[in-house]
């Protein structure tokens, strides 16, 4: 099995190294095509106004000056065009990609691009808690990643579907199993704009979430990782809401 590995945190990110290790538990044919620089939050964007620069870092390892979607396209349609990968793995992201994160995530987008190109694809992210990124427990994803991927491949990934996997903020032995979960929803009232001024008095802003108690919904990815379970969420490329499609069609016919 040929595996293409990408991410959005960049070619030198520790999560990419973690995912390479996971991939090598599954296959000895692992290729890496990742962004030259951090592309967190770029979602499914493409570089349409700038050329893509490709740099070979080492054997089977490439960096692209572009987005995660660019990287997957370059990997599938250029670097590996004569022998396409059988699986695209994107991650391991530095931080969870649950709830609304899915719409912003470059990690999810890397898997999404693989799905668009007709290749099975899985996005993987490692949550962190109050200790912040400095105390991120990569060992959790490293210990459980290969087994979760094997199970997903055994179940099968249908065309047009990608799978989002989130590892909880705990030690490997503290994981309470796997929860197949729906995409959750945060309390958006907690989103704040933090206004500041630089040394010259010019304003600038940070987006931030207020710290407040929040009870995630049952059966969601948010709930799963809060309970130290690995959240597995199938996502569909087709964003059409079928019930609403029927309702709108009936209304326009009236």
From Swiss-Prot:
SUPFAM superfamilies in alphabetical order: SurE-like
Primary residence: cytoplasm
Catalytic activity: a ribonucleoside 5'-phosphate + H2O = a ribonucleoside + phosphate
Cofactor(s) for this UniProt protein: a divalent metal cation
Binding site for a divalent metal cation: 8-9, 40, 93
Assigned EC number: 3.1.3.5
GO annotation, cellular component aspect: cytoplasm
Protein known as: 5'-nucleotidase SurE
UniProt lineage: Bacteria, Pseudomonadati, Pseudomonadota, Alphaproteobacteria, Hyphomicrobiales
């Amino acid at each position: 099995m040929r595996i293409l590995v990408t991410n959005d945190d960049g070619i030198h990110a520790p999560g990419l190294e973690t995912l390479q290790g996971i991939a090598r538990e599954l296959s000895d044919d692992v290729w890496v095509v990742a962004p030259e620089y951090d592309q967190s939050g770029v979602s499914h964007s493409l570089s349409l106004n700038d050329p893509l620069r490709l740099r070979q870092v080492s054997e089977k390892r490439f960096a692209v000056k572009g987005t995660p979607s660019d990287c997957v396209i370059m990997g599938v349609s250029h670097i590996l065009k004569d022998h396409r990968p059988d699986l695209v793995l994107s991650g391991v992201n530095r931080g969870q990609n649950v709830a609304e994160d899915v719409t912003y995530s470059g990690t999810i987008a890397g898997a999404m691009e693989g799905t668009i190109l007709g290749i099975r694809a899985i996005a993987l992210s490692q949550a962190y808690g109050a200790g912040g990124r400095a105390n991120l427990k990569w060992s959790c994803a490293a210990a459980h990643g290969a087994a979760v991927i094997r199970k997903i491949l055994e179940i099968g990934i249908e065309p047009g579907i990608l799978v989002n996997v989130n590892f909880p903020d705990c030690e490997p032995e503290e994981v309470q199993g796997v929860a197949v979960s729906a995409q959750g929803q945060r309390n958006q009232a907690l989103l704040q704009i933090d206004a500041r001024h630089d040394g010259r008095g010019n304003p600038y802003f940070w987006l931030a979430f207020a710290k407040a108690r929040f009870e995630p919904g049952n059966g969601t990815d948010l709930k799963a990782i809060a309970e130290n379970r690995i959240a597995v969420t199938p996502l569909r490329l087709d964003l059409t809401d079928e019930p609403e499609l029927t309702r709108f069609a009936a209304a326009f016919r009236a």
